[in-house]
UniProtKB/Swiss-Prot annotation:
Tissue and organ expression note: Detected at intermediate levels in skeletal muscle, and at low levels in heart and pancreas.
Protein name: Survival of motor neuron-related-splicing factor 30
Residues where Phosphoserine is found: S201
Main subcellular location: nucleus
Length: 238
């Protein structure tokens, strides 16, 4: 599925580039502007579907860490961290620290779940507990945590399925609009006046293929006149 979405994303981006190129010469065309907006929207939807779990984890942790804390962590420290499965914070212990990438491997106390999370998302235990108390949250039991995890995954799957459906509909709409755009680009310039290629077959036996007509289609070519007698000697005074 990810491979298909990646191909679709590349196709949408290519179409957007062509629309932007067309707009450079006709920036007020409403159809092109609407098509550009729709393509940008479907590109964002596709990017969102291709987003990885770490990105979702970082986004879910925004409610837990509104500001980036500054704390010197070391292996064995207790902390409060966000669990990626439900977006809630729990007490954990730091098992390993990757200073280069700014991440820590942690294990949630009482549950045994291991996870790698950015150091900036960790909070001291007391500060984290106070934040949970202020928000009215109570520590969950393991059974409650598993049930919440199951419900979270179910909702996430339903939401993803709905977004995929919307994306497919957007793709079909864009396909039709893009075909209409291409058809207009090669259709007649004015009603009743069809634009013809200069390489089209002539309608009469005297017409020449590849010669611009400029309104004199099917007329004989202008006869060549020999002007060699008008050389420089005729211009010299006698």
């Amino acid at each position: 599925m990810s491979e298909d979405l990646a191909k679709q994303l590349a196709s949408y981006k290519a179409q957007l580039q062509q629309v932007e190129a067309a707009l450079s010469g006709n920036g007020e065309n409403e159809d092109l502007l609407k098509l550009k907006k729709d393509l940008q929207e479907v590109i964002e939807l596709t990017k969102d579907l291709l987003s990885t779990q770490p990105s979702e984890t970082l986004a879910s942790s925004d409610s837990f860490a509104s500001t980036q804390p500054t704390h010197s962590w070391k292996v064995g420290d207790k902390c409060m961290a966000v669990w990626s499965e439900d977006g809630q914070c729990y007490e954990a212990e730091i098992e390993e620290i990757d200073e280069e990438n700014g991440t820590a491997a942690i294990t949630f106390a009482g549950y045994g779940n291991a996870e790698v999370t950015p150091l900036l998302n960790l909070k001291p235990v007391e500060e984290g507990r106070k934040a949970k108390e202020d928000s009215g949250n109570k520590p969950m039991s393991k059974k409650e945590m598993i049930a919440q995890q199951r419900e979270y995954k179910k909702k996430k799957a339903l939401k993803k399925a709905q977004r995929i459906k919307e994306l497919e509909q957007e793709r079909e709409d864009q396909k039709v609009k893009w075909q209409q755009f291409n058809n207009r680009a090669y259709s007649k310039n004015k009603k009743g006046q069809v634009k013809r290629s200069i390489f089209a077959s002539p309608e009469s036996v005297t017409g020449k293929v590849g010669v611009g007509t400029c309104g004199i289609a099917d007329k004989p070519m202008t006869q060549y006149q020999d002007t060699s007698k008008y050389n420089v000697r005729h211009l010299m005074p006698q």
